[in-house]
């Protein structure tokens, strides 16, 4: 049995065992999603609070827990009818004891849509049946798990993405069926022990997100779930996070075609991520980030987990650099935010892959100047309108930034980037607005991206992170967006009526439009209108 499935099975056993026993919690655990997280903006980004906001997912406790309970209990209907209570107010199964809580929900996600612009005019649909369970024991143990069985027909551009990457975006391996149908499973599990108000340990099959933006140039929640152990420490104004991850990349080749066919991979990789966040005051926060990725096997043979990286200190670079022939991929980064107004926060990131001072400031397009930048602003109650939240963001990455000399040790997980979905060699501007009123939720998103892709002969232009940086054609004269020029315009609008906020059961209607103009090629155009009965808080990234 795969480690992730074994872990999930053990967690589900614990859930049932404790949930049905006779055992009011003060903490909650839930996967991260932007659309849910933005509802906490007035607490997270208020100049009256001093919370660590950039390491996600985080536990809901104290004022966040109060807000969580408020959001999931709002608009209760007064009814003694069991069906009406379960439909509008309660979890399907709910246990609230003095020192523990337990809940279980069925999560339907049914959607049907129609392609209005693309020439194939296909009917799109999603048929998902899921379960979620949550358990707390006093204020020490928190557990969350979900499982989804899915079939779907996607728009053309997502169909093409899955054909190349062999995954549903952010949700793992996909099986191709007839007539464009896809079949896949998706699961999440997270078990946290809270030693005190200062230290937490989490074992999870989930994702992580470092940053205050919608995207992250450091570590994002875009790729599929992976098994990891996370330590979080909070002392005064300092929060420290250390993550040790076991990841899969089954698509990666097992042989190095550039080195006489030497073996360098078995589809397994490891990662260590450290993040140190310091709240200077109520308005300013600064964080330091570093990561290292290594293959489970390389030319020297089986390696497994490297215990040199078990050191929880934020000093991985010296450890890695002591090995002059290190096959590991290393990154360092900076994350910062400043609450410029009562209801607006500016944020940013800087990622550094390689640095040579002479070349970095030389302005000569040196290929090994590998960096990425994010700048953004987000806020709440825009124009004095209660619950009108917003975000505007700019992201850029130099060519070759996330590549490595072999793809198994690049900055990816299960065939997708660990940072920005576009990989590298791009500029991107995006904006998101969310508004909630009574039981209604509205969202509007727009994205513009200019990026370069590889030509037909496969020359490495720096955007495809699965290429080897040993195949860089020109060491100098490189620029962002080089290669085949692409211009992407994406817009998405949704309106939903929330039936049950406990598990986000909602009636939803939406329209998604995507135009991609490719140099000297026919433009790719798509416009899909959809309606559905949806639930859960999981993210699905189709905006790429």
Positions of the model-derived regions?
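Short regulatory "switch" loops immediately downstream of catalytic or recognition motifs
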Residues: 1, 14, 247-250, 449-452
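Bacterial Sec-dependent N-terminal signal peptides
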Residues: 1-30
């Amino acid at each position: 049995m795969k480690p992730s499935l074994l872990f999930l099975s053990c967690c589900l056993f614990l859930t049932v065992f404790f949930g049905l026993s006779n055992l009011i919690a003060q903490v909650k655990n839930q996967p991260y999603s932007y659309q849910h997280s933005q509802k906490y903006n007035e607490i997270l980004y208020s100049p009256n609070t001093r919370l660590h906001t950039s390491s996600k997912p985080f536990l809901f406790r104290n004022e966040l827990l109060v807000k969580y309970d408020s959001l999931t209990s709002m608009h209760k209907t007064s009814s003694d009818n069991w069906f009406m209570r379960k439909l509008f107010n309660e979890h399907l199964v709910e246990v609230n004891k003095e020192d523990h809580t337990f809940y279980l929900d069925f999560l339907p996600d049914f959607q049907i849509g129609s392609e209005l612009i693309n020439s194939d005019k296909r009917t799109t649909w999603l048929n998902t049946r899921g379960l979620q369970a949550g358990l707390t024991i006093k204020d020490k143990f928190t557990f969350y798990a979900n499982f989804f069985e899915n079939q779907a027909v996607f728009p053309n551009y997502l169909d093409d993405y899955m054909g190349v990457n062999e995954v549903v975006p952010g949700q793992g391996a996909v099986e191709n069926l007839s007539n464009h149908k896809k079949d896949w499973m998706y699961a999440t599990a997270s078990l946290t022990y809270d030693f005190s108000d200062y230290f937490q340990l989490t074992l999870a099959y989930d994702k992580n997100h470092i940053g205050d933006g919608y995207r992250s140039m450091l570590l994002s929640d875009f790729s599929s779930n992976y098994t990891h152990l996370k330590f979080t420490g909070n002392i005064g104004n300092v929060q420290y996070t250390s993550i040790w991850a076991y990841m899969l990349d089954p698509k990666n080749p097992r042989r190095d075609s550039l080195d006489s066919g030497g073996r360098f991979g078995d589809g397994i990789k490891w990662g260590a991520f450290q993040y140190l966040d310091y709240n200077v005051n109520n308005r300013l926060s600064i964080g330091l980030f570093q990561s290292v990725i290594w293959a489970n096997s390389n030319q020297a043979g089986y390696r497994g987990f490297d215990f040199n990286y078990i050191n929880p200190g934020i000093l991985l670079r010296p450890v890695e650099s002591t090995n002059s022939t290190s096959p590991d991929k290393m990154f360092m980064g900076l994350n910062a935010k400043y609450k410029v107004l009562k209801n607006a926060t500016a944020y940013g990131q800087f990622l550094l892959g390689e640095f040579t001072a002479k070349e970095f400031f030389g302005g000569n397009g040196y290929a090994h100047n590998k960096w990425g930048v994010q700048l953004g602003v987000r806020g709440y109650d825009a124009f004095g309108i209660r619950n009108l939240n917003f975000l505007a963001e700019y992201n850029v990455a130099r060519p070759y930034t996330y590549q490595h000399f072999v793809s198994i040790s690049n900055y990816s997980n299960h065939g997708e980037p660990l940072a920005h979905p576009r990989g590298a060699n791009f500029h991107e501007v995006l904006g998101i607005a969310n508004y909630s009123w009574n039981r209604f939720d509205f969202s509007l998103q727009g994205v513009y991206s200019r990026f370069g892709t590889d030509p037909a002969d496969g020359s490495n232009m720096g955007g495809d992170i699965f290429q080897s940086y040993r195949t860089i054609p020109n060491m100098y004269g490189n620029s962002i967006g080089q290669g085949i020029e692409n211009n992407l315009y994406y817009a998405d609008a949704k309106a939903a009526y929330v039936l049950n906020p406990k598990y986000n059961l909602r009636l939803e209607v939406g329209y998604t439009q995507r135009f991609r103009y490719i140099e000297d090629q026919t433009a790719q155009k798509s416009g899909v209108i959809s309606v559905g009965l949806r639930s859960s808080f999981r993210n699905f990234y189709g905006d790429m």
